[in-house]
Amino acid sequence: MAISAAIGTPLETCLAQAVDANPALKDAAAVVAAVGRSAVEISERIGRGALGGDLAAAGDHNSDGDVQKALDVIAHESVTAALRGAPVAEVASEEAEEVMRLNPDAPLAVAIDPLDGSSNIGVNMAVGMIFGIRPSIKDPANPLASFTTPGSTQIAAGFVTYGPATALILTLGEGTQSYVLDRTEGRFKLTSPAMSVPPSTKEFAINASNARHWDAPVKAYIEDCQRGTEGPRDKDYNMRWLASLVADIQRVLTRGGVFLYPGDARKNYARGRLRLLYEVAPVAMLVEQAGGAATDGQTRILDIVANGIHERAPLVCGSTEEVTCVATYYAGGKPDAGRSPLFGQRGLMRS
């Protein structure tokens, strides 16, 4: 349900209100509360910085081959411990190779990235946590059954941004809300009961250093944005890139914009870098519930079915006009319309 509570209302009160309106959300609300408690604990560890030890220290490699930082492990252990006390049957985590079985008879499954943006740890930049809550499917013949359903089956989704303030962005399936951690009380409080992504924008977020590897539709779209009022987009754009998915998406949810992490020609990047279950699908639900859109360029994100828990997917999300425009480029629309022949031959991003 949409939250109607006043600004400053504690998360627990808002969750209780949602359950009163829709008792079917009782278990999901319990999971969100558990994640929130873990986020408070993780926020405290991050807030101590180097005084709490070298949180950026390298360790083993995770399921995707990334080097695990000390804080990756701390966050994973914290949230897993919290979820053991919640109605969660299984967890798919970025930091675990296989699905973790918690409470076999519980009704829910959680896909989670315990620490997004770990490359930012050592430089005091924003990091976060991303999660999606789904029904647990009891199928002995398919141990991945709970996670091989479309993203549209998610009951709730959210992320936490550990930045200047620690923020929780949450949807329970009707609207997207934001909460901020009140450090004096150690709990999250409502700051926006209805986040809304404007339909149009003049901002895009993409890692432009990979431009030479992009597929033609992405090159064409970004090139047209860079042409500003002289090009077919007919407006001047700004570029933003924080190298932290949660921070980039929070900006989109707060003031609009379009975020792109496409697949590209680099080895192992054909489907981008982001993981479908515990990064892309939760973000897509949050953005859609705030009035935006999310696609991989050709297919609505929430219609995609994962084949494995660490599967990747390209992501284009945010303001609907721009997301629709990018999809048009992918569909082979007319991205050359409005370009001068000279620019088409010598544009900065032409391969």
UniProtKB/Swiss-Prot annotation:
Record field: catalytic activity: beta-D-fructose 1,6-bisphosphate + H2O = beta-D-fructose 6-phosphate + phosphate
Compartment(s) where it occurs, according to its Swiss-Prot or TrEMBL record: Cytoplasm
Classification via CDD domains: FBPase
Uppermost EC category: hydrolase
A molecular-function term among this protein's GO annotations: magnesium ion binding
Pathway it works in: Carbohydrate biosynthesis; gluconeogenesis
Record-level GO cellular component terms: cytosol
Annotated positions binding substrate: 116-119, 207
Chief location of this protein within or outside the cell: cytoplasm
Residues that bind Mg(2+) 1: 94, 113, 115
Family (UniProt): Belongs to the FBPase class 1 family.
Listed name of the protein: Fructose-1,6-bisphosphatase class 1
Gene: fbp
